[in-house]
Amino acid sequence: TGFDPFLIYPEYLLLLLNELNSSGAEAISINEQRIISTSEIRLAGNHIVINGEKFSRPFVFKVIGDGQTLQSAIQLRGGIVDLLNSNYIQVTIKKEEEITIAKYSGLVDFDYILSNEEQEQ
């Protein structure tokens, strides 16, 4: 299959997510899905799956952190915002005084990590 200019590929979301994380984001959600270390972001047909839920445009990132630092990081010349814009993806940045990001509501299942209670048994 060829490149679809109207489809947002998960790689774009992951690049933005990584830039925000490396710039000090303390909490991030995409379309109200809290992002944690085990969150999946993948393509499924014409949708992006985030934490098991299907989404399509628009994608709204909510980010808690130092607004100036985060904005500067993603707006570097030749950075992620330039990449998105060059791929026909419009980016709008809006600073808010107060942002609420819900806690992760899914299950976190680990195979190799034990809780303190499990270790004591």
Regions found by a protein language model. Name each.
Residues 1-5, 118-119:
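Low-complexity, polar-biased intrinsically disordered regions enriched in Pro/Ser/Thr/Gly
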Residues 3-85:
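Soluble extracytoplasmic domains of inner/organellar membrane proteins
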Residues 64-121:
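Extracytoplasmic/luminal low-complexity segments enriched in Pro/Gly and acidic/polar residues
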